[in-house]
Amino acid sequence: MNILVVEDEAIVAMEIEQILLGAGHHVVGIADDQREAVAIAKAAKPDMALIDMRLADGESGLDVATALGHLGVRSTFFTRTFPRQDGNGVALGYLHKRFGDRGLLDSVEVIRALIDGTIPASLPPTLHIFDAPMQKKISGK
């Protein structure tokens, strides 16, 4: 899967990149702001973007996801805080930032399934889907 990572903390971005590369994904680029994310997305056409909710200089991951959505790129946030339903309609969902290798990779597979239009068997505990009916279908609750 071709993935764009939008994260302003270089060490965190590199860790995410290494996890994804190790699992056979292709990281098309790492951006630390909206301008760079849009430029990379236009050039590389990623399948999805993983976006930090809070970027440097007060930039919002919501704004980045909205801009990428106009380019046809589906986004998922990662955050340390619960974003409520702020991203509903803009992103598929969010991962808690302390997701670990397995949590990240399992979440990417669920996101891939959702983008492909299939319903995954389950959700990893680190991933929350904004679409409540879909969340219920997946969790069986």
Where are the regions that the model predicts?
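A short, hydrophobic beta-strand element within the central beta-sheet of small alpha/beta folds
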Residues: 72-84, 95
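Charged docking surfaces used in two-component/phosphorelay signaling
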Residues: 14-18, 22
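Acidic, metal-coordinating helix/loop segments flanking the phosphotransfer/catalytic sites
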Residues: 17, 30-48
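Conserved acidic carboxylate
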Residues: 7
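CheY-like receiver
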Residues: 106-108, 115-141
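Conserved phosphotransfer microenvironments
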Residues: 51-69
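Conserved phosphotransfer cores of two-component systems
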Residues: 42-44, 67-73
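Hydrophobic/aromatic docking surface of two-component receiver
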Residues: 98-100
